């Protein structure tokens, strides 16, 4: 284009003057004999915890909580139903992802559990889901049972949590 057609709107920007002074900030001062100075997270120790790397398996969405009571399960199922999701129960002897047949992920590596009966289309009562959970626990007492919430409009699973852990399982909590 011709130079006369283009309108130039140059703006001036102040040159970079460096970072703001940190003199007013509460920072530990470094000592001259150490490259790290007096670095300390002592003030934060009360609020930080480290997850143990052995002995506690993480299973599903709510696995960081203590085992769910019947009342807790009812509340979760009622939330699932209020959200217009279809409840479904699944079970598995191994409650976590594993690879047995191949190094790469595949269909039979523990991500897919066996469905207990059919999805509970039309279910409106949380106690119906709990009755199915009790039946699944009686039929497979040594299996993990989880409840999932399926959105049949978007065709996706939106919630999943362990509802029963078999006795003797790490962190089973007697649920």
UniProtKB/Swiss-Prot annotation:
Principal location: plastid
Region named Interaction with large subunit: 60-64
Cellular compartment(s): Plastid, Chloroplast
GO BP terms: photorespiration; reductive pentose-phosphate cycle
Top-level taxon: Eukaryota
GO CC annotation terms, alphabetical: chloroplast
GO molecular function: ribulose-bisphosphate carboxylase activity
UniProtKB keywords: Calvin cycle, Carbon dioxide fixation, Chloroplast, Photorespiration, Photosynthesis, Plastid, Transit peptide
Keyword Plastid set for record: yes
Transit peptide, residues from-to: 1-46, 1-47
Family classification: Belongs to the RuBisCO small chain family.
Note: NADPH and 6-phosphogluconate function as positive effectors to promote enzyme activation. The basic functional RuBisCO is composed of a large chain homodimer in a 'head-to-tail' conformation. In form I RuBisCO this homodimer is arranged in a barrel-like tetramer with the small subunits forming a tetrameric 'cap' on each end of the 'barrel'.
PANTHER family: RIBULOSE BISPHOSPHATE CARBOXYLASE SMALL CHAIN 1, CHLOROPLASTIC, RIBULOSE BISPHOSPHATE CARBOXYLASE SMALL SUBUNIT 1A, CHLOROPLASTIC-RELATED
Cited function: RuBisCO catalyzes two reactions: the carboxylation of D-ribulose 1,5-bisphosphate, the primary event in carbon dioxide fixation, as well as the oxidative fragmentation of the pentose substrate. Both reactions occur simultaneously and in competition at the same active site. Although the small subunit is not catalytic it is essential for maximal activity.
Assembly information from the UniProt record: Heterohexadecamer of 8 large and 8 small subunits.
Protein name, as recorded: Ribulose bisphosphate carboxylase small subunit, chloroplastic 1
